[in-house]
Structure formats: C-alpha cells, structure tokens
Amino acid sequence: MATPLSPAFFDRDPVKVAREVLGSTLVRVLPGGEVLSGRVVEVEAYDCPRDPACTAGRFHAARTAEMAISPGHWLFWTAHGHPLLQVSCREKGIPASILIRALEPLTGLGSMLTHRPVSRERELTNGPAKLVSALGLKPAEVVGTRVDSPALHLLPPPALLPADAVTVTARIGIKEGRNLPWRFLLRGNPWVSPGVPSMDLAGPLTAKS
C-alpha cells in the first residue's frame, strides 16, 4: 500500500505541489471504519502573499493568518457559506495553499450519496464544496490536522502525470491574479468542475512535467 503524502511534501511552491497532487487519491475514513476515496482530478494553487488573489476579497486578514501554519495541514476557507478543502504549503508563517476542487469517486459511493443526494452521480464531487459534503467532512474536526492523518490523507499517484494528460487554465472565481495558470485538471475527465476560468488565457496551455 502506498504511503500517504507527508507534510514535508507540501513545504514548497504550491504551484508545483498542485501539479504533482493531481491524480492522487484522497482517502476519508469514517468513524465507523468505512473508507471513502476519490481521485483528485482538479486542483488550484494559491501562493500567498505574493498571489494577487490573496488580497482581493477571497482572503481577509484573519483567514490569511489561519492559513499561515506549518505546511502539510488541512485547512478550510468558506465561499458562499460552504467550506472548501485546502492544504497549507511553504514554511510556517507563509499562507500559501492548494485547493482541492474536484474528485472522481473510487470507493464508498453509497455513503457519499447518503451525505449528498444527487440525481446525477457526476454532480456528486465535481466541485470543492460538493466534495466536502460528499465525504462528510466537518471542518471543526479536520482543520489543523496533518495531511497524513489516518482519518483524512492523500495517497500519491503511481507516477507524475504526463503533460498531455493535464490541462492548465486560469483559476475560477477570482478578480485578481486572473492571468496566472494555476488551475490543473485531468484532461477530458468528466468529474472536473463546471466552473468557468476567470480568464481565457491566450493559446493552448499544457502542464510541464
């Protein structure tokens, strides 16, 4: 069995982390022992404080302070009243992070549907708030815990995804930093979020290995 990604993995540039987390498996172990899991098919990077998006309303001062903890810990920010799952990056004191935006369900589909009933399965985890709900995550129980904790962790992909398997776009729902290609998704995967990038970046973009 693969070893979960350790906090040390996240102690660096969140853009590089996001690219390498794509294709990993997010594992949630419920209190009763049932395992829910999904393949990470969409990730965004936020490299605060140098990232213009961090000063444009999405991150107020208190929230930014909460993010400035040691790397490799689970965090949440709230958007439109919904908690979104992220992981702290870079050294302690720098509020950089990655945001997990979408999952392709692998195990525990029945429980996910119980947590978040939907008429179309593809709408179960194809968004950052949706996946938090489907996994039954309670921010108060998770925030500040290590990314390799038994209850919630990430298993690395077998290998770094090749460039031709990855699409890179601008991020979704931001007003500043719209020109930064810091959203990574599995090309052609039906579980990616339906959100529209904040800017149509000129020319086709592919991720570099």
Swiss-Prot record:
A Pfam short name: Pur_DNA_glyco
Disulfide pairings: none
EC number: 3.2.2.-
InterPro entries: Formyl_transferase-like_C_sf (IPR011034), MPG (IPR003180), MPG_sf (IPR036995)
One MF annotation (Gene Ontology) recorded for this entry: alkylbase DNA N-glycosylase activity
Keyword Hydrolase (UniProt): yes
SUPFAM superfamilies: FMT C-terminal domain-like
Gene Ontology BP annotations: base-excision repair
Residues that span the membrane, as ranges: none
Superkingdom of source: Bacteria
Keywords, comma-separated and alphabetical: DNA damage, DNA repair, Hydrolase
PANTHER family reported in the protein's UniProt record: DNA-3-METHYLADENINE GLYCOSYLASE
HAMAP family cross-referenced by the UniProt entry: 3MGH
Family statement: Belongs to the DNA glycosylase MPG family.
Protein name as annotated: Putative 3-methyladenine DNA glycosylase
Species for this entry: Deinococcus geothermalis (strain DSM 11300 / CIP 105573 / AG-3a)
